[in-house]
């Protein structure tokens, strides 16, 4: 049972200003302007190839790993442009974490999956690591299922458990924002329901931006939805408003299934 959505805080944590992205000569994102509120869930929807996943990756500079990328415009996180020359990218990716479409646990124990990030960032004390592992697994609603087998290989978990483990691994390094790229697309309905409930619970402490092809999912969990088409945001508004009273003809056609 997914609990009722609470209103987000009226405080901007991320803002993009005329953000464009080029793959060599191809313009994949075209002057994106959007404000993300703290402790909110923002859903990004649109047909395949519309730019929503590309946009998501600009928010913690994951696109830097792709050759031939050029960025124009700004991404402001907590008042600073993350594309400025002196911005600490490692710290950025700690504060803005990422959960991918396919669960990708490391080939190591459940415990080591969670403790890996904190160790990299300097936490060595075993008692502190134990605490981080337990709290991260509790926040991801996985602790009760794995507390007696923390030394078991993470790949022994089910797909849904692996995805919650990946969320726990992200939480372990204390992010402020969690980016999710279709985190339930490879999961069965029961596992999907657990992840959705988890996402809503996480909103109390984190800001979440999620790419989803599932419009029903966007309706169930998000506060605001942005509809992407051809590298642009065609429309963004509170989720209920966008789905039940869209202002843009293309939005209405997409959510009614006329294309996509």
From Swiss-Prot:
GO CC annotation terms, alphabetical: plasma membrane
Q: Which SMART domains match?
A: AAA
This entry's Enzyme Commission designation comes to: 7.3.2.1
MF-aspect GO terms: ATP binding; ATP hydrolysis activity; ATPase-coupled phosphate ion transmembrane transporter activity
**Does the record's keyword annotation contain Lipid metabolism?**
no
Query: Where is this protein localized, as stated in its record?
Result: Cell inner membrane
Query: Pfam families given for it?
Result: ABC_tran
> Keyword ATP-binding on this protein?
yes
Q: So which domain of life are we looking at?
A: Bacteria
Q: What is this protein called?
A: Phosphate import ATP-binding protein PstB
Source species, please?
A: Borrelia garinii subsp. bavariensis (strain ATCC BAA-2496 / DSM 23469 / PBi) (Borreliella bavariensis)
